[in-house]
Amino acid sequence: MKNAEYGLTENLIFKEAVAFLKKKKTLTADEYKLLDEESRAKAFTVSGYTSMEVLQTFLNELSDACEQGKTKKDFMDNMNDFLLRNGYTGLNPFKADVIFRTNMQTAYNAGHYKSMTDPTTMKLRPYWKYTTAGDGQVRETHAMMEGRIYRADDPIWDIWYPPNGFRCRCSVVSMTKAQVERSGVEVSKSAPYDIDFSTGEIKYRFPDKGFSNNPAKSAWKPDLSGFDPA
């Protein structure tokens, strides 16, 4: 995207990310809430709107932004022009940012996921590392995942694959076995957790509410059978 907004430069626009958005089906928020998490990965909605024409216009503008490298401002200007012409209140900057960032990040990460789960790539780069933006705005639970390395087929990625909340800036990078060994980081085998020392209870940490799933995997369903990182 222009100005490398949210890390989505033109060099990182995957055709799979565009396809991920274009395959989505528009639903009202009430209809969306009735779906299971796997089905939600293939659906699209924006709270506050029930018109299919409006919802489809949102989706079309997001798809165009992903495909053509448009910015959040382009998206907001185009949507507000449409909304105001049709008797709706325009988007404020905060809502435009949430809609744009969440959908662009989800699409980008879906495209990235498909790339990383290519059989050849999986064989060469069989480990994945979770990374955050590394600043003071990173959520506590997300920060607990920073730098953790897991096998690419570890079930953790069914829960902790970004985005893991609204406006989440986390990402995942693939690694070779040699890179993992050089990093000196032990491969994790469990989700992050806290221990209540007064009771000894282990409390596993999860993504933000509504984000404990992997929409990329639900959309692409890679075949991980027979995968061996060794």
Residue ranges of model-derived segments:
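Domain-core detector
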Residues: 1-165, 173-230
